[in-house]
UniProtKB/Swiss-Prot annotation:
GO terms for biological process: glycerol catabolic process. Its EC number is 1.1.5.3. This is Anaerobic glycerol-3-phosphate dehydrogenase subunit B. It comes from the Bacteria. It comes from Haemophilus ducreyi (strain 35000HP / ATCC 700724).
Length: 426
């Protein structure tokens, strides 16, 4: 099989890169094994929420110079501020298809399921968000759970929201939806999850009864916070509820798998395939062959004898969570190409004792491990550049995606950087 570009990994980074390349006329294939991390995400995307020093970031561009001083190995710093901002703006134009709101010019705050407020870059329009130093626009808020669903506790949410200045003016009420169609799922707690709820409601729901139940439980509330379990493939079902109830409905992400993240994944996947891209689902890249210093072909679990050939290869396999990186006893390793590994200043790959911090709650050095790249996201093997192999997303080293709140930003910025470079390379 021959392609212009083969992408290993079908998460946010891989699909974003694939879509951008397909739009440029490249023929791409994505090798995808299992669920991507986006399926487990809140649906909000972070650009940079926190500097390595712990300082909160409000305006990305204002924090960039400080980031460069504190973490020169960060992918943003390798690419440069001009390139990062250009790709961020490019993604913000594309984000409308995902139903996201926000801007790199100012981080906003999103409400978490436990009632906290987190700085973020982009959020689904259905999620409650607040601008910095502003109050939530509604005073009367109803928090509605679902009877028998134990992974969401409205009282905890309310108690924590009351401690935030943005909600200090609000009056809260708590209620529970019965939804008789869910009685079958209530018999087995293991099946009573957001995805199962959404699947069942999509096919066996008395819609008008649900509308009336929400309106009755909401009482005099101006805004209603619901679990994100209404609408499996997109937000049309939730938007219909919002219109029918004539209430300001908002949804909060649940414990993984996250319905909001799954919607985003399916939107990206569908667009990639509509543009003519090929998804090789349930397959895993296992080894590669080189012609000189270039990758010539790869082999997968399902194609052990038949090679997959391309002019360019993109590694978007993620970090430890998705086996894009593996930790052997003596080193952290990238398992397909055995590429060079870097991390933050404290991480030394050959010294296992440097992988962890003695404080359990601290950012662990091993979490910053990943492959080394240059400013075009090309990778290195034994110190030598591989000109037609690129890395994007969380497989890259030199940053803490969770602690610094930049995992999604690194994914889309590096993905679009590679798409631009490969698209202009003959």
């Amino acid at each position: 099989m021959n392609f212009d570009v083969v992408i290993i990994g079908g998460g946010l980074a891989g699909l974003t890169c694939g879509i951008a390349l397909q739009k440029q006329g490249k023929q791409c294939a994505i090798i995808n094994n299992g669920q991507a991390a986006i399926d487990f995400s809140s649906g909000s995307m972070d650009l940079l929420s926190c500097l390595p020093s712990g300082q909160k970031v409000h305006v990305f561009c204002e924090a960039f110079s400080e980031l460069s001083q504190q973490a020169p190995e960060h992918p943003y710093c390798l690419l440069g501020q001009h390139q990062v901002v250009a790709k961020v703006q490019q993604f913000e134009q594309f984000m409308q298809e995902l139903g996201l709101v926000g801007s790199h010019k100012q981080n906003h705050l999103r409400v978490t399921p436990l009632g906290g407020l987190r700085h973020t870059w982009l959020s689904p329009k259905s999620v409650p968000v607040i601008a910095e130093n502003e109050h939530f626009p509604y005073r009367q808020i109803a928090i509605l759970g679902i009877e028998g669903y134990h992974d969401f506790q409205p009282q905890i949410l309310v108690d924590n929201l009351k401690q935030n200045a943005a909600f200090s003016h609000c009056d809260f009420s708590i209620g529970y939806l019965n939804i008789p169609e869910l009685d079958y799922l209530r018999q087995n707690a293991r099946e009573f999850r957001s995805v199962n709820i959404a699947q069942l409601l999509e096919h066996k729901l008395a819609f008008e009864d649900l509308v009336q139940e929400i309106k009755q439980a909401a009482g005099n509330a101006q805004a209603v916070f619901l679990l994100a379990c209404f609408g499996l493939d997109d937000q049309r079902f939730f938007d219909s509820l919002k219109q029918a109830t004539a209430l300001a409905l908002f949804e909060l992400p649940t414990l993984p798998p996250s319905l909001i993240g799954i919607r985003q994944y399916r939107t990206l996947r569908d667009q990639f395939e509509k543009l003519g891209g090929l998804l090789l689902n349930g397959d895993r890249a296992v080894r590669a062959e080189f012609d000189g210093d270039r990758v010539a072909r790869i082999f997968t679990t399902l194609h052990q004898e038949e090679s997959i050939n391309a002019a360019h290869f993109v590694l978007a396999s993620g970090s430890f969570f998705s086996n894009g990186l593996v930790a052997e006893f003596e080193r952290v390793k990238e398992p397909i190409f055995d590429l060079d590994i870097i991390g933050n200043k404290a991480f030394i790959n050959s010294e296992r004792v440097s992988w962890t911090d003695k404080r359990f709650a601290a950012a662990q050095p091993y979490q910053s491990a990943g492959v080394a790249i240059n400013h075009h996201c090309q990778v290195y093997k034994n110190g030598h550049l591989i000109p037609n192999l690129y890395a994007i997303g969380n497989v890259i080293g030199g940053f803490w995606g969770i602690e610094q709140g930049c995992a999604s930003g690194v994914s889309v910025v590096t993905a679009l950087t590679v798409a631009e470079w490969v698209g202009g390379t003959k």
